Amino acid sequence: MTKTVILISGRGSNMQAVVQANIPNLRIAAVLSDNPQAPGLAWAAGQGIHTAAINPKDYPCRADFNQAMLETVAGHAPDLVLLAGYMRILPPEFCRRFANQTINIHPSLLPAFPGLHTHQRAIDEGCRLAGCTVHFVTAELDCGPIIAQGAVPVYDSDTADTLAARVLKIEHQLLPQAVADFAAGNLSIHGKRVYNRRTAGETGQN
């Protein structure tokens, strides 16, 4: 059983998608947040999942908060740490502790547009496709090995909000499948590439 801790900062719609997918061999040990008011905490608690908030305002400095979050996550001894709308950059020591065990979903087709404001940046650059990326987390922001990507068209009439809504629908499909592949032992990392045993026979040929 793949014991999983999910980190969120807001409503956690991707977390909800993972929970509702009822993924085989996955047990969600906890949903944690840096925001005590995160709506996703109440939703997870309503599903009978253990929740906790680690509020950075309760700590004198960022290093102390980071240590508290690391210790809280480690206390659950997870096989997988899932970032589902967690809006803080993980410190290097966290990335080292849970190397090859931490997965993030990012709202762009990496390596394009790491960081914030991805949808507006895609529009501003004239992209005809946008999307999302599920990847393993490393200390270098949004640069870890890519597990899966999903794309949507960018329309001339799009705003950042309309594009974000279209991408989010793909996120809700892509992340549960990637988590299921992790839990099934389908994923292996070779340098910057992730090989997926489930899709190994796909060649792209008709």
Please tell me what each predicted stretch does.
Residues 21, 34, 84-196:
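Donor/substrate-binding cores of folate-linked one-carbon enzymes
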